[in-house]
Amino acid sequence: WIGDAESREVVNQYAKAFVETVRASGGNNPNRCIMVTPYAASSSRQNMEALEVPQGDDKIIVSIHAYLPYSFALDTAGTDQYTSIDSSITTLFTDINEVFLSKGIPVIIGEFGSVNKANTEARVQCVKDYLSTAKQYGVPCCWWDNGTRIGNGENFGLLNRSEGGWYFPEIVDAI
């Protein structure tokens, strides 16, 4: 998820071409908000600092994916315990502020969440801490709901698409 200098440069070239293409395509596109991501949409400070946000365009938003704390939120073999705000969450938003927000560049967390490990209460506490920290910095966040809630792997599902209800209403209420 960190990549190397060459990979990060390819992403920068892609972002530049993307912005130029959208802006030149007519219609409302010169005024449309569009998003760019660091390499792998990674929340690593190294990748955020390497992102070259196109200059002179106040409608560019940086989108980052951040599943934190990793061992709790994304690592399926990791811990199912979460009891208090984790330093990785505060570090993320401090980094976002220093790298982007302080320079007038808006950021959205395009993906966040925590996998289902039969630990709803811990997930509720984590989402409350995550979102309250994000709110302090004015960063909106989108829970990644991939429709899966049980089994091995990345189970982020909240919405029961078949029956039209919530698998974990407590988490939805916390959001």
Language-model region placement:
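Active-site region of glycoside hydrolase catalytic domains
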Residues: W1-G78, T94-S114, Q136-Y137
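Non-membrane alpha-helical structural segments and their capping/turn regions in soluble enzymes
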Residues: A5-K16, D86-T90, E121-K128
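Alpha-helix initiation/capping motif
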Residues: S42-S44, I85-D86, S114-V115, Y167-I171
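Aromatic-rich peripheral "rim/lid" segments of glycoside hydrolase catalytic domains that contact
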Residues: N119-I175
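Generic hydrophobic, helix-prone segments enriched in Leu/Val/Ile
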Residues: F18, L51, I89, D129, ...
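Acidic/histidine-rich helix-loop elements
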Residues: S71-I89, E163
